[in-house]
Amino acid sequence: MKIHLVSGLLLLLITASCSQKDATKKVVSFYHWKSKATINQQYQQALKSTNTHKIYLHYFDIVSEHEANWYDDGIFPTYVLKEVDPAYQNFEIVPVVYITNQVFQVSNLEVQKLSNRIKDLVHQISQKHFKKDISQIQIDCDWTESTKYAYFELLESLSDEFDLDVTIRLHQIKFKEKTGVPPVKKGTLMVYNVGDLKDFDQNSILQNSIVKQYITADTKYPMPLNIALPLFSQTVIKNKDNKIKIINSVDRPTFENDKHFKQINTSQFEVVKDTLYKGFYLSEAYGIKLEELAVTEIVDSYNTIKQSKLITNEILFYHLDKNSLSNINLSELVEKL
């Protein structure tokens, strides 16, 4: 009798332990943000190692190209998804539509007309590449206090047809009384591009000290949030007029070994002699900032979010890209998150 009782208790403990592990298991997804959704061995390895089942696939941008006139409202889709590898049909796809804030500053904006155009194009792309309609989409927009009413009206219209997820920036969490809370049931907190590109003492991609300026232990938000984290690095070039250009990669050995550049500190360089770099003409005195991410910085920033009162769900990495996946130890990162 005692043997059976002990065996039963052991089985119960093992089952409980497994249940706890399952409950805390990380759910990881990826963004794909290119007009041609290709797949290669590197992508496949990243998806397999993280047990990813969902891809947030960029479908198109909506931009305001010119002032409204007699012929049109100046609002058009750009960077429309052109090709999709059949391998993506094995994943749950969440279409992503990026809308610039300027769209909602257009005078006499016809929100319902814009909503219908977005619905139609999403369905067209889904049918073309996946032979079906997709019910869940993500809307990505860095709205402001002055544009919230038009943006929220659009979300309400889109909600009639789609299960919506919307992106939320750090400032929209901290200042939610001003920027408002979108009329949706779930969101994705964008924990990247948090700083100032022009501030060469910052890593504008991600810096935990900046995240802490917006998120505290008492921070709340009235909807569950996925957490979007960066994998990418970038080179920031600042000219004499303080204007910025970005190169979506970092080639540290070139700056450290080429005599056209002088190293100021770990991340900063100065052009000391005119030169060409990746198609950009760099003049003497231009500033160079290398923005690279360490696993520890991503983990620390993520922990700042987790230690708040925000309700969090899956982890979403930006993004499936050769340089991004080459510059970060993905296995180590996922293990530490």
Model-found features: residue ranges?
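Conserved beta-strand positions in the central sheet of alpha/beta enzyme cores
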Residues: 54-56, 138, 188, 316
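C-terminal motif of bacterial Sec signal peptides marking the signal peptidase cleavage site
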Residues: 14-17
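Catalytic domains of carbohydrate-active enzymes, especially glycoside hydrolases
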Residues: 40-65, 125-130
